[in-house]
Amino acid sequence: MRIAVLKFPGTNGDYDVLRALELAGARGELVWYRDYAAGKYDAVVLAGGFSYGDRLRAGAIAAATKAMDHVREDAERGVPVLGICNGFQILTEAGLLPGALIPNDPPGFISRWVAVRVVDTRTPFTYLYEEGEVVYMPIAHGEGRYVPAGEYKAAFKYVDNPNGSYDNVAGVYEKNVLGLMPHPERAVDPHVSRRGAGGLKLWLGLISWLRR
């Protein structure tokens, strides 16, 4: 099993993802974006951060790289793809997920724990959750307000909307591709996570799905 953790200039959540995978029983591989190639990995995670300093728009420059062409190719083959925070922004900019992430309303950077409801369990990342289950994860973003572009499928919704996101959406998916603004990799260890380990099931679900 090979799980790539894709790193762009400005990515800063990569080691948190590697740690989350380790706690869930797998070993991720940190992959510099120029070294990523389609057909080599069983899953890929786009970690959070500020790729290219959020120039132009959050995720816009990373979305235009050759690496994302390879990610798109893998996604079309059914490889599970996860984008967290800035990774979610990259996926929308690249057209792998519908809609866009725009500045928060009210504006400003938000960094706190939030309650998130699982509303769809039909993905490789959510199928171990119960539909309607509420978990806690931290958020840390200034451009996390989701706006749809036509039809979309929500996987997670905020219990108490922190950023003005349409219909309380915290994460959306399309087949095997999932993006979410909350950070499941920072909610995996009950000894250090302030509000429990609600993100751990996401990683356990991915690993279980890959082992089927």
UniProtKB/Swiss-Prot annotation:
Q: Which InterPro entries match?
A: Class_I_gatase-like, PRibForGlyAmidine_synth_PurQ
Domain Glutamine amidotransferase type-1 span(s) in chain numbering: 2-212
UniProt xrefs under SUPFAM superfamilies: Class I glutamine amidotransferase-like
Q: Which SMART domains match?
A: GATase_5
GO cellular-component term (any): cytoplasm
Q: Does the keyword Ribonucleoprotein belong to this entry?
A: no
GO MF, one example: glutaminase activity
User: Could you tell me which pathway this protein works in?
Assistant: Purine metabolism; IMP biosynthesis via de novo pathway; 5-amino-1-(5-phospho-D-ribosyl)imidazole from N(2)-formyl-N(1)-(5-phospho-D-ribosyl)glycinamide: step 1/2
Q: What is its EC number?
A: 6.3.5.3, 3.5.1.2
The GO annotation for biological process reads: 'de novo' IMP biosynthetic process
Q: Which superkingdom heads the taxonomic lineage of this protein's source?
A: Archaea
Q: Where, by residue number, is the active site? A: 85, 183, 185, 191
Sorted alphabetically, the keyword list is: ATP-binding, Cytoplasm, Glutamine amidotransferase, Hydrolase, Ligase, Nucleotide-binding, Purine biosynthesis
- Could you tell me what reaction this enzyme catalyses? N(2)-formyl-N(1)-(5-phospho-beta-D-ribosyl)glycinamide + L-glutamine + ATP + H2O = 2-formamido-N(1)-(5-O-phospho-beta-D-ribosyl)acetamidine + L-glutamate + ADP + phosphate + H(+); L-glutamine + H2O = L-glutamate + NH4(+)
Subcellular location(s): the record lists:
Cytoplasm
Q: Keyword Cytoplasm, does the record have it?
A: yes
What is the recorded function of this protein according to its Swiss-Prot or TrEMBL entry?
Part of the phosphoribosylformylglycinamidine synthase complex involved in the purines biosynthetic pathway. Catalyzes the ATP-dependent conversion of formylglycinamide ribonucleotide (FGAR) and glutamine to yield formylglycinamidine ribonucleotide (FGAM) and glutamate. The FGAM synthase complex is composed of three subunits. PurQ produces an ammonia molecule by converting glutamine to glutamate. PurL transfers the ammonia molecule to FGAR to form FGAM in an ATP-dependent manner.
Could you give the subunit structure recorded for this chain? Part of the FGAM synthase complex composed of 1 PurL, 1 PurQ and 2 PurS subunits.
Kindly provide the name given to this protein in its UniProt entry: Phosphoribosylformylglycinamidine synthase subunit PurQ
Q: What species is given as this protein's source?
A: Pyrobaculum aerophilum (strain ATCC 51768 / DSM 7523 / JCM 9630 / CIP 104966 / NBRC 100827 / IM2)
Q: Which gene encodes it?
A: purQ
